[in-house]
Amino acid sequence: GQVFPQAALEWLQAHGALVRLGQRVQSLGAAPQGSGWLVDGVPFDAVLLATPSTEAARLVSQCAHTAPYTWTVALCDWAASAQALRFEAITTVYLQAVPGAGGRTLPLPMLALRSSPQAPAQFVFDRGMLGGPSGLLAFVASASQGEREHITQQVLAQARTQLGLVQAEPVQTVVEKRATFACTPGLQRPTAQVAPGL
């Protein structure tokens, strides 16, 4: 949701940062003598590159042309590793259940579940305990595979078997196909810092 982005935005603005939202960056380059960065030609001391990996790879590849010579190989390597990332889906299945005493459906706001190929959800969140509608549960299946309806039915069976929620009914299923990158053995992950100030 909006909890973390809004808090980050407010903190940045309170500390004097210029935040521009809803603008696609066309170009990113190193300022002369590595004295900062040029975003669409506008100079900045530092840049937080918060984009999908494919977009980050595009922008960092451009940087290699204007960056100090000593950064060129590192920038190209970073762009290649970002471009090579493969994605996996995260599916969230929302079920409406009958809340118990005190409006709670689960004993805690979040529970870990036993997942398997037939029971794909790893976690469940009681949205009612987190400020949402009473009885609304969000089951999260990371690295999910398969059709939306099939996953929904698997999670519904998992809720009934593992949590005893026999009266739970599906409300909505959201599949974010590129939600995360695949954490595979030997993965060459791009580093958090691309170059000084980036």
Language model feature labels by segment:
Residues G1, W11, W37, Q96, ...:
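Tryptophan-centered motif/residue detector
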Residues G1-H15, S142:
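Helix-loop-beta segment of a Rossmann-like dinucleotide-binding subdomain
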Residues Q2-Q6, T54, Q153:
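A structural signal for well-ordered alpha-helical segments within the folded catalytic domains
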Residues A8, L28, V47, L111, ...:
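Generic beta-strand hydrophobic packing signal
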Residues L12-V25:
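A conserved beta-strand/loop element that lines the FAD pocket in flavoprotein oxidoreductases
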Residues R20-L21, G164-K177:
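A short coil-to-beta-strand element that immediately follows conserved catalytic motifs
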Residues Q23-H150, A157-L163, P190-T191, A195:
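Mid-domain catalytic core of redox enzymes
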Residues E176-L198:
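FAD-binding beta-loop-beta segment adjacent to the flavin cofactor pocket
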